[in-house]
Each structure stands twice: as structure tokens, then as C-alpha cells.
């Protein structure tokens, strides 16, 4: 949902095309934002960017794009899958679930799913990356605590 509450972004897969779309809640008008295997779209707290995960070069990486469809930028360049991202309340940082560190043997032997692996925090432009978790199981779907709570 856009911070103004008037639009939302969602992914679509199907015969009409794959990608992200934006719908105006008041008019039901729909606009195609991206084309491709894009997923997990999230509006920035300031409303100026939409962050999403895109399948490119065999792995998922995090991208941002302006709501008008301009300014596409690749944020992560890992050799693993990056997804399940979340904005910090001020929009200055993101947290991402990633398999960039590889998989642990324990998951292979126990049939435990490890599609993403560990959590990483970074600036919203992809710099200053810090690993937050390191364990034998998957850590994923992070969420920030709301500001001031």
C-alpha cells in the first residue's frame, strides 16, 4: 500500500503477462509497472520507491523502481537468492533474507527448506551490508518494529 493509502502494488503471473502492477483504489485503474518474474513488492515509507525481488541471471536480487516506472535500480548483487525484504520505518535501511552464504549441511539431511538462509541489513542503496543471523536453519520474512514503538 502506498503511504497515501490511494494505491497498492502487487505481482501478477499469468497469460496477461508477468510483473508488478499498481492499482488506484479510488478508480480501480491498473498500470503495469514491470514486466518479468518480479515478486514481493513493497512501497517505501516515503512513497518515492517500490522495492521488489527480481529473478535475473539465475538468482533473485533486490531492485527498486519509482512508482511511475522510471529509475529501475539493482540494489543487491549476491550470488544467492535475496527476497522477503522489508523497509526500515524511515526508509533508510532494508533487511533482506538471503542465501548468499550458501546452504548448511543440516538442512540437506533433514529436508528443511532453506531457500533464503540468513538475514542481512543494509542501507537502502545496497551499501553497508551486515549479516544479522547465522544458524543452521532458514531465517526469513523479517519485519521492522514501527518507529517509536
Q: At which residue positions do the language-model features occur?
A:
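Conserved beta-strand position repeated once per blade in WD40 beta-propeller domains
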Residues: 40-42, 84-86, 141
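Residue-level detector of Asp-centered blade-edge/turn motifs that repeat once per structural unit
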Residues: 3-4, 45-46, 89-90, 146
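Blade-level signature of beta-propeller repeat domains, shared across WD40, Kelch, NHL, RCC1
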Residues: 114-115, 126-149
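A flexible loop/linker signature enriched in serine peptidases of the S9 family
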Residues: 11-20, 34-35, 53-63, 67, ...
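Short loop/turn segments that connect beta-strands within beta-propeller blades
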Residues: 24-28, 66-70, 123-127
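Hydrophobic beta-strand positions that form the internal "hydrophobic ladder"
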Residues: 5-8, 47-51, 75, 94-95, ...
Amino acid at each position: 500500500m502506498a503511504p497515501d493509502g490511494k494505491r497498492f502494488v502487487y505481482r501478477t503471473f499469468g497469460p496477461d503477462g508477468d510483473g508488478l502492477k499498481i492499482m488506484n483504489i479510488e478508480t480501480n485503474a491498473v498500470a503495469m509497472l514491470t514486466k518479468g518474474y518480479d515478486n514481493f513488492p513493497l512501497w517505501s515509507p516515503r512513497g518515492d520507491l517500490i522495492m521488489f525481488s527480481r529473478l535475473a541471471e539465475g538468482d533473485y536480487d533486490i531492485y527498486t523502481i519509482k512508482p511511475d516506472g522510471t529509475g529501475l535500480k539493482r540494489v543487491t548483487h549476491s550470488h544467492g537468492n535475496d527476497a522477503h525484504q522489508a523497509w526500515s520505518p524511515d526508509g533508510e535501511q532494508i533487511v533482506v533474507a538471503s542465501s548468499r552464504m550458501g546452504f548448511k549441511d543440516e538442512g540437506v539431511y533433514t529436508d528443511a527448506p532453506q531457500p533464503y538462509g540468513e538475514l542481512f541489513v543494509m542501507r537502502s542503496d545496497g551499501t553497508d551490508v551486515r549479516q544479522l543471523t547465522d544458524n543452521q536453519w532458514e531465517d526469513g520474512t523479517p519485519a521492522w518494529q514501527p518507529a517509536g514503538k
